[in-house]
């Protein structure tokens, strides 16, 4: 902890030729908000900026100012190579920590080394470094502390029983050594108590082991369920930007593989780690009572082994992290291929997908084998060291027995106890690799739990239903996707959707039409300008209310869930009655084909609705959008992927659904938007021209050119795109 709080310019060691560099006091951001700039977690310097929550004291600022004045006039030596963290970092933290804390308790919140700073404000979620979050871990562990405490007590009891067993075995050996065959009766009498005592200890040990393993399973499984639930909830609450940047396979991997890995490590730490540590400590006490000289041999060898393990740990931890990330990438490739298997089959790309997945698996194998070699090296060295310890014990212990300084029974007890120590430390060495993987997995899980979305799911005001008109205004909106910040999709975009009217957006692909719909749904916030509903900024409204009750969205490729038709329609309004579902289906022209199925509304549609035709899926999507009675309806290429007959049926449903609602239609087929109250032609992220169908044809602008092109391209012959006018035409639309 001190390393994080007091890195004040001393890492990297002293300068050549200087005894100690001057301390560089800087402001310290209490919250380590990191953002992506090439590498996640890299901090940058912002001169003169202070944390909003914590400001340095006037004394600290004066010292910093004086230091900067003196530093400017001092001769400077070249900087030594910087290591992070270095030995000087540890020394400085240890020496300065108590002193600074005693002088000013808030200095730990306002000191930052020269190379670090607070980042500027960003609209993208902050991704923290992949470090194990002990605070989050405590939140999951806290509800189970009582059960865990009982399990720990039972594990400690089992360990203490194991400590007593070597002593009793030594006493039994003493009895065996004292008597010969002529003293059978006395031997049986004296050994009976020891044997009975040993049997009782073995039974108690078995019961204690059973108890703590059952309780650990109870705690571990419940923690895993809580973690998966919290992680899934956190993922669902992330911005759409987050899902643009992360593959589904990697997210699923964290929900399954990483949580399982962490749970296994947690259970092993208690069941084997705590027990082994207790046995090592208890046996060392027993060993010191039996023979101080032999115990010193173990005490000298043990720190050396721990030092080697610590040095190897950092490298193995990094390898484990890389291995898990590679597994997630492989799962992402598999998920993508299997999720789009129809497209893969249509293009006969099975071989290519196999090669892609095979390449990722090969990378997984290489990293896993490298990690395995590292763990094997560690365990091999540990076994060699432990066996050498046993050999040394036999050699020195035998000489002590020969010199009458140690009895045979004590040597037997020492050997059994040392074997217990050896076995426990071997378990710890095996546990080391598992703990490394578990900490890495836990860090990956907690990393996503700690993310805070820029657009919350709820919070803000709601407009009463009777006061909601449905007027939508885009005022001087500029927007760039966070994954492509240098490319503006919308540029000074201004548009008004009058209440109860149909406004159609047309234009070439890439003009920003779908982006307009995404901003209206508030999947993203504009980088400049404002989007308003009835004169209220969308950012002041409750997003959950906006999406759940006000805006209905029907896309070109509707996504259905692998459940019944009834549940798919009810997805738009969970509390809807069966009669409301039937009404929405009739309004969407879906009731007839649904009732033609043997199971009717209880028909399971299959994954993504694969058992239904395109027109049937689209009508179910319309019913799902209409069941919540939205005030604003978005139709994004809702009929472009359908055949003529399906398009006719779906268009009838859309016309019926549009009555009395504010409708935003995005279309490529211009024939479907001729009846719109206003047709807006978009080009280069701007409104190029607007008006009714007849008005735009009379203007002879871009819309008229698009109409002519579509008439010529009816046979689907290739043709170059139409030329853009030299500039947008002035227009006024009367609602």
UniProtKB/Swiss-Prot annotation:
Signal peptide: none annotated. Channel activity inhibited by ATP via ABCB8/MITOSUR subunit. Changing residue 513 to A: Abolish binding to ATP. Keywords: ATP-binding, Ion transport, Membrane, Mitochondrion, Mitochondrion inner membrane, Nucleotide-binding, Potassium, Potassium transport, Transit peptide, Transmembrane, Transmembrane helix, Transport. CDD domains: ABC_6TM_ABCB8_like, ABC_MTABC3_MDL1_MDL2. The keyword ATP-binding applies. It is a multi-pass membrane protein. ATP binds at residues 507-514. One of its GO terms (molecular function) is ATP hydrolysis activity. PROSITE patterns: ABC_TM1F (PS50929), ABC_TRANSPORTER_1 (PS00211), ABC_TRANSPORTER_2 (PS50893). InterPro entries: AAA+_ATPase (IPR003593), ABC1_TM_dom (IPR011527), ABC1_TM_sf (IPR036640), ABC_transporter-like_ATP-bd (IPR003439), ABC_transporter-like_CS (IPR017871), P-loop_NTPase (IPR027417), Type_1_exporter (IPR039421). Residues 26-144, 217-295 are mitochondrial matrix. Residues 150-437 form the ABC transmembrane type-1 domain. The chain crosses the membrane at residues 145-165, 196-216, 296-316. Induction: SP1 transcription factor binds to the ABCB8 core promoter region, possibly regulating its transcription. One of its GO terms (biological process) is transmembrane transport. Residues 1-25 form a transit peptide. Residues 472-709 form the ABC transporter domain. Ubiquitous. Residues 712-735 are annotated as: Disordered. One of its GO terms (cellular component) is mitochondrial ATP-gated potassium channel complex. PANTHER family: ATP-DEPENDENT PERMEASE MDL1, MITOCHONDRIAL, MITOCHONDRIAL POTASSIUM CHANNEL ATP-BINDING SUBUNIT. ATP-binding subunit of the mitochondrial ATP-gated potassium channel (mitoK(ATP)). Together with pore-forming subunit CCDC51/MITOK of the mitoK(ATP) channel, mediates ATP-dependent potassium currents across the mitochondrial inner membrane. An increase in ATP intracellular levels closes the channel, inhibiting K(+) transport, whereas a decrease in ATP levels enhances K(+) uptake in the mitochondrial matrix. Plays a role in mitochondrial iron transport. The mitochondrial potassium channel (mitoK(ATP)) is composed of 4 subunits of CCDC51/MITOK and 4 subunits of ABCB8/MITOSUR. Interacts with C10orf88/PAAT. Interacts with NRP1; NRP1 regulates ABCB8/MITOSUR protein levels in mitochondria. Belongs to the ABC transporter superfamily. ABCB family. Multidrug resistance exporter (TC 3.A.1.201) subfamily. This is Mitochondrial potassium channel ATP-binding subunit. It comes from Homo sapiens.
């Amino acid at each position: 902890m001190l390393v994080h709080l007091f890195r004040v310019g001393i890492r990297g060691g002293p300068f050549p030729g200087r005894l100690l560099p001057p301390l560089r006091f800087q402001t310290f951001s209490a919250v380590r908000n990191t953002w992506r700039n090439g590498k996640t977690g890299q901090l940058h310097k912002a001169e003169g900026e202070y944390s909003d929550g914590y400001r340095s004291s006037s004394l600290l600022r004066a010292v910093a100012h004086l230091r900067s004045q003196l530093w400017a006039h001092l001769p400077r030596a070249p900087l030594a190579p910087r290591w992070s963290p270095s030995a000087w970092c540890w020394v400085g933290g240890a020496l300065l920590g108590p002193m600074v804390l005693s002088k000013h308790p808030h200095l730990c919140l306002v000191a930052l080394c020269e190379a670090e700073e607070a980042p500027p404000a960003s609209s993208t979620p902050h991704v923290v470094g992949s470090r194990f979050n002990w605070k989050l871990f405590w939140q999951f562990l806290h509800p189970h502390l009582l059960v865990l405490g009982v399990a720990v007590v039972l594990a400690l009891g089992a360990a203490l029983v194991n400590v007593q067993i070597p002593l009793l075995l030594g006493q039994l050996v003493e009895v065996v050594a004292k008597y010969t065959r002529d003293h059978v009766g006395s031997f049986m009498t004296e050994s009976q108590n020891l044997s009975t005592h040993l049997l009782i200890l073995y039974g108690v040990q078995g019961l204690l082991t059973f108890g703590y393993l059952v309780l650990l399973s109870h705690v571990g499984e419940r923690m895993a369920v809580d973690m998966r639930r919290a992680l899934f909830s956190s993922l669902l609450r992330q911005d759409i930007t987050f899902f643009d940047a992360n593959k589904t396979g990697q997210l699923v991997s964290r929900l399954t593989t990483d949580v399982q890995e962490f749970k296994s490590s947690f259970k092993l730490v208690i069941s084997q780690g705590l027990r082994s540590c207790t046995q090592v400590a208890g046996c060392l006490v027993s060993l010191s009572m039996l023979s101080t000289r032999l115990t010193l041999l173990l005490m000298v060898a043990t720190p050396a082994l721990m030092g080697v393990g610590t040095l190897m740990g950092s490298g193995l931890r990094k390898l484990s992290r890389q291995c898990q990330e590679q597994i997630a990438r492989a799962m992402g490739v598999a998920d993508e291929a299997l999720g789009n298997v129809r497209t893969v089959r249509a293009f006969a790309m099975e071989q290519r997908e196999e090669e892609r997945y095979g390449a990722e698996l090969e990378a997984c194998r290489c990293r896993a084998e490298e990690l395995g070699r590292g763990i094997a090296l560690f365990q091999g060295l540990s076994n060699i060291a432990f066996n050498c310890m046993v050999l040394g014990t036999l050699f020195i212990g035998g000489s002590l027995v020969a010199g009458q300084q140690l009895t045979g029974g004590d040597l037997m007890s020492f050997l059994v106890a040392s074997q217990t120590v050896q076995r426990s430390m071997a378990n710890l060495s095996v546990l080391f690799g598992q703990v490394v993987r578990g900490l890495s997995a836990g860090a990956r899980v907690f990393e996503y739990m700690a993310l805070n979305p820029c657009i919350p799911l709820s919070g803000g005001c709601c407009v009463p239903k009777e006061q909601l008109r449905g007027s939508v205004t885009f005022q001087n909106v500029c927007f760039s996707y966070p994954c492509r910040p240098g490319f503006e999709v919308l540029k000074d975009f201004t548009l008004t959707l009058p209440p109860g009217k149909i406004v159609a957006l047309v234009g070439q692909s890439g003009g920003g039409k779908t982006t307009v719909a995404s901003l209206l749904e508030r999947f993203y916030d504009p980088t400049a300008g404002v989007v308003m509903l009835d004169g209220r900024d969308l950012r002041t409204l409750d997003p959950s209310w906006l999406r759940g009750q006000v805006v209905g969205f029907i896309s070109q490729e509707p996504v259905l869930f692998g459940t019944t038709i009834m549940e798919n329609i009810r997805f738009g309004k969970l509390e809807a009655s069966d009669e409301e579902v039937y009404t929405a289906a009739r309004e969407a022209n879906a009731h007839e084909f649904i009732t033609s199925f043997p199971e009717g509304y209880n028909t399971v549609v299959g994954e993504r609705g694969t058992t239904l035709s395109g027109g049937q899926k689209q009508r179910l999507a319309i019913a799902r959008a209409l069941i919540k009675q939205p005030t604003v309806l978005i139709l994004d290429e809702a009929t472009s992927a359908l055949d003529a007959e399906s398009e006719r049926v779906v268009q009838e449903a859309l016309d019926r659904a549009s009555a009395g609602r504010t409708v935003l239609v995005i279309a490529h087929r211009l024939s479907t938007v001729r009846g719109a109250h206003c047709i807006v032609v978009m080009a280069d992220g701007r409104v190029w021209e607007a008006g009714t169908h007849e008005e735009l044809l009379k203007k002879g602008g871009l819309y008229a050119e698009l109409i002519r092109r579509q008439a010529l391209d009816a046979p689907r012959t290739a043709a170059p795109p139409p030329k853009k006018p030299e500039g947008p035409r002035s227009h006024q639309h009367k609602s």
